[in-house]
């Protein structure tokens, strides 16, 4: 469309108002604005007028759609249509502004390119809302209505002015100010938990964030490291912390993408077993991969499939993990290839699994005398090992103790691969010249130090008239009894894989040395299948198994004199063997001092208190005199009643006697002074008010009451205490009634029941009544009871 300004009916006017023109001027709003012309929407009437940009009095760059203008109306000379001339921009009126608080409902899209870039003034809009008098109102806004260089997001809290377009009547928001950004919810994984707080590994950046347990919205008992959570980040004291922590379904947060394809590479740097103080790299390991361009991938201690020790030069297979947050690549799911031992410089050894414990075990080595410790985590290929399995392994020093070795990288071998030695089928006879000892008896933990090195024993034997000697080890002895000096044994001779070495194996005891010394002792303790013997010096006890007793075990009683020999079993522990009953200790030949002393037990026998180290008990004289405070030992022989259980603190009377081969003065004929009252009597048993150990009542059976007396509650009694060796519980025996207790008097009816009976009103119609629905009858359908009811005395059975 062409336009000629000279065609306007302006009567020679220059087109610009000088303030003296009397022409009628109107107002309107720029509705459309193009490069050289535009259109105005009139405010006072429904009309849309064309105008040429040359008719605008001012900088055209400041004119935009929506601006208020003042103009005159003229007509196009050629077409006769009304047009606007002499345009002047009207300054906006200043109205009192009321600012409203609200929030963004729909944000203006960011980086949205206009489909018609040639059309200025057309920009995308968003919407906000506010509340007034319980109603919610929605307004539109554009990015130009936002103050400052701020990009609003949905949910942001804002403050704005309501603008009412007087020309179009449209209401919008302008002068928008951001009050508070919406708190974004982040996701992560709980990576550490302390006493009252923890840390979350964030899913958006490679960073950990602190959280306090009070911020967890849920059951804290169920929260554990590895759980997926979402949270809000807040700033407290200048530090970011996680708040409003909530659980997410497992698997929601994914940090990395793991390749499906497997790769192979070579370990160039291993993770140190003991990290240095300056070690800050969380992925210290390195694996070289032969891609088109060779590269090294890092890995950490959690990236291996198992805990098997990696060595430099190992050939491994792995996946590549790519972190979504920073795109860092690392090797993961690392497993050692079976052919890796061809490329490493390690010395491999062989052996057989000798023992298995909880999480660790021991290997009997082919080339070493000592058993080699190993941990289950060092087993390759996830195999489960059993005792006698043949294995191959590498020996390395322990990181915590250089003097101790252990086996790593254990590989299971086929049966028949390992051979310790070749031995002849011929059996030899010999005599033990030196006993063999173990190194560490009953080793259950690899952290226990060696108490004593193992020592080989020596066997003297005759081979074709030539007297020879050969070494043997305690582990090669068959049976539970170790041979002692002078014992006859049978054995085989084996050649170890290490050349030039012979050793006796499969050593079996044939007979004890007939000249072995026989000792006397006294039965001190009897358990289910073993017991202890008090030595002739009465200062210690010796273990013996019932299988070593010649005779009926049931005939053994505490205090019986026995004869025995000493033997060393596995673990260098001394025990009694070939136990024979001699004669009763009651016929003791030593003469006791006739003086009777009063004393107090200050230490019981070890059989009563197994926690104490010393076997002997101790009694202190408490009666006035020159000997008050003197202490004398005692054993099972010194007890008047061998089954009596003397406890610490009990009062006793005793005599003194010189006993034992070392002529020691000891307490003898010890009798406890116990007196207490009967707590209660049941049918066939009762309880005495006497404290024994943790129990404040002492049990007794009625058959233990002497002279057939029927005890009543409150009776004062004397008694002995015996210890059940099988159950470890004490009970009373030999119960004598010293004096009767007070007779039980029937207690009167309590006042509360008497008062209640007095207050019952039988005539009250509202009172609860008891109605008989069915009369009682006996089994034969008769009424009443055949036997007369009698008053029964408590504790007496008819």
Swiss-Prot record:
Family annotation (InterPro entries): CSD, CSD_CS, CSDE1, CSP_DNA-bd, NA-bd_OB-fold, SUZ-C
Domain of life: Eukaryota
Single GO BP term: stress granule assembly
GO terms of molecular function: lncRNA binding; RISC complex binding; RNA stem-loop binding
Residue(s) of cross-link: Glycyl lysine isopeptide (Lys-Gly) (interchain with G-Cter in SUMO2): 91
Gene Ontology CC, one term: P-body
Main localisation: cytoplasm
Domain SUZ-C: residue ranges: 748-789
Annotated TM spans: none
Modified positions (Phosphoserine) in chain numbering: 123, 276, 514, 584
Compartments where found: Cytoplasm; Cytoplasm, Stress granule; Cytoplasm, P-body
Keywords, ordered alphabetically: Acetylation, Cytoplasm, Isopeptide bond, Phosphoprotein, Repeat, RNA-binding, Ubl conjugation
Positions bearing N6-acetyllysine: 81
List of residues that carry Phosphothreonine: 761
CDD domains xref list: CSP_CDS
Domain CSD residues, every copy: 26-87, 136-179, 186-245, 297-337, 349-410, 447-507, 519-579, 610-670, 674-735
Biological role: RNA-binding protein involved in translationally coupled mRNA turnover. Implicated with other RNA-binding proteins in the cytoplasmic deadenylation/translational and decay interplay of the FOS mRNA mediated by the major coding-region determinant of instability (mCRD) domain. Required for efficient formation of stress granules.
Subunit structure: Component of a multi subunit autoregulatory ribonucleoprotein complex (ARC), at least composed of IGF2BP1, PABPC1 and CSDE1. Interacts with STRAP. Part of a complex associated with the FOS mCRD domain and consisting of PABPC1, PAIP1, HNRPD and SYNCRIP. The interaction with PABPC1 is direct and RNA-independent. Interacts with EIF4ENIF1/4E-T.
Protein family per UniProt: Belongs to the UNR family.
Name used for this protein in its record: Cold shock domain-containing protein E1
Taxonomic source organism: Mus musculus (Mouse)
């Amino acid at each position: 469309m062409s336009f000629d300004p000279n065609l306007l009916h302006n009567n020679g006017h220059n087109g610009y108002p000088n303030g003296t023109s009397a022409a009628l001027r109107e107002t309107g709003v720029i509705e459309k604005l193009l490069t050289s012309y535009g259109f105005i929407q009139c405010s006072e009437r429904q009309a849309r007028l064309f105008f040429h940009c040359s008719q605008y009095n001012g900088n055209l760059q400041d004119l935009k759609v929506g601006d208020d203008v003042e103009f005159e109306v003229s007509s196009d000379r050629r077409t006769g249509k009304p047009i606007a001339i002499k345009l002047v921009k009207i300054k906006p009126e200043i109205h009192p502004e009321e600012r409203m608080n609200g929030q963004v409902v729909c944000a203006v899209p960011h980086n949205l390119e206009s489909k018609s870039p040639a059309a200025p003034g057309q920009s995308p809009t968003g919407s906000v809302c506010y509340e007034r008098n319980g109603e919610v109102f929605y307004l539109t806004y554009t990015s130009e209505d936002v103050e400052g260089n701020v990009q609003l997001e949905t949910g942001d809290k804002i403050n704005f002015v309501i603008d009412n377009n007087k020309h179009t009547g449209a209401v919008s928001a302008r002068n928008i100010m951001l009050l508070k950004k919406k708190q974004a919810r982040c996701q992560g994984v709980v990576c550490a938990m302390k006493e009252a707080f923890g840390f979350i590994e964030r899913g958006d950046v490679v960073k950990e964030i602190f959280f306090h347990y009070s911020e967890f919205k849920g059951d804290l008992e169920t929260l554990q490291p590895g759980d997926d959570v979402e949270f809000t980040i807040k700033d407290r004291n200048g530090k970011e912390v996680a708040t409003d922590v909530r659980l997410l379904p497992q698997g929601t947060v994914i940090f990395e993408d793991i390749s499906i394809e497997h790769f192979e590479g070579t370990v160039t740097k291993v993770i140190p077993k003991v990290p240095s103080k300056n070690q800050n790299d969380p992925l210290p390991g390195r694996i070289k991969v032969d891609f088109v361009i060779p590269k090294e991938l890092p890995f950490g201690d959690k990236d291996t499939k198992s805990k098997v020790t990696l060595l430099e030069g190992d050939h491994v297979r792995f996946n590549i993990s790519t972190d979504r947050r920073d795109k860092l690549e690392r090797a993961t799911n690392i497993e050692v290839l079976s052919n890796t031992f061809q490329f490493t410089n390690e010395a491999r050894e062989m052996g057989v699994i000798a023992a298995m414990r909880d999480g660790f075990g021991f290997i009997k080595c082919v080339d070493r005398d000592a058993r080699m410790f190993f941990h289950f985590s060092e087993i390759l290929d996830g195999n489960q090992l059993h005792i006698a399995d043949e294995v191959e392994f590498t020996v390395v020093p322990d990181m915590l103790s250089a003097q101790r070795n252990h086996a790593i990288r254990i590989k299971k071998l086929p049966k028949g691969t390992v051979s310790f030695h070749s031995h002849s089928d011929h059996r030899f006879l010999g005599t033990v010249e030196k006993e063999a000892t173990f190194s560490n008896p009953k080793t259950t933990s690899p952290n226990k130090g060696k108490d004593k090195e193992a020592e080989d024993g020596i066997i003297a034997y005759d081979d074709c008239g030539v007297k020879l000697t050969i070494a043997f080890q305690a582990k090669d002895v068959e049976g539970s009894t170790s041979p002692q000096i002078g014992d006859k044994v049978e054995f085989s001779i084996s050649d170890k894989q290490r050349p030039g070495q012979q050793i006796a194996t499969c050593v079996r005891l044939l007979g004890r040395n007939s000249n072995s010394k026989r000792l006397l002792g006294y039965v001190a303790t009897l358990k289910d299948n073993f017991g202890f013997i008090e030595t002739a010096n009465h200062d210690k006890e010796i273990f013996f198994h019932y299988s070593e007793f010649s005779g009926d075990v049931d005939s053994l009683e505490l205090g019986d004199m026995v004869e025995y020999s000493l033997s060393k079993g596995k673990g260098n522990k001394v025990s009694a063997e070939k136990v024979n009953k001699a004669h009763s200790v009651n016929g003791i030949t030593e003469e006791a001092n006739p003086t009777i002393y009063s004393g107090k037990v200050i230490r019981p026998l070890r059989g009563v208190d197994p926690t104490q180290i010393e076997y002997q008990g101790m009694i202190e004289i408490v009666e006035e005199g020159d000997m008050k405070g003197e202490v004398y030992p005692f054993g099972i022989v010194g007890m008047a009643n061998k089954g009596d259980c003397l406890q610490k603190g009990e009062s006793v009377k005793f005599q003194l006697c010189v006993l034992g081969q070392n002529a020691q003065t000891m307490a003898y004929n010890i009798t406890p002074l116990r007196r207490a009252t009967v707590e209660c009597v049941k049918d066939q048993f009762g309880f005495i008010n006497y404290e024994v150990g943790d129990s404040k009542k002492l049990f007794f059976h009625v058959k233990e009451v002497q002279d057939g007396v029927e005890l009543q509650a409150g009776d004062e009694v004397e008694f002995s205490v015996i210890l059940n060796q099988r159950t470890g519980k004490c009970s009373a025996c030999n119960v004598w009634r010293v004096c009767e207790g007070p007779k039980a008097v029937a207690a009167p009816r309590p006042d509360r029941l008497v008062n209640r009976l007095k207050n019952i009103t039988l005539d009250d119609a509202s009172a609860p009544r008891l109605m008989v629905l069915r009369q009682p009858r006996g089994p034969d359908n008769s009424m009443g009871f055949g036997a007369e009811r009698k008053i029964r005395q408590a504790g007496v059975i008819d």
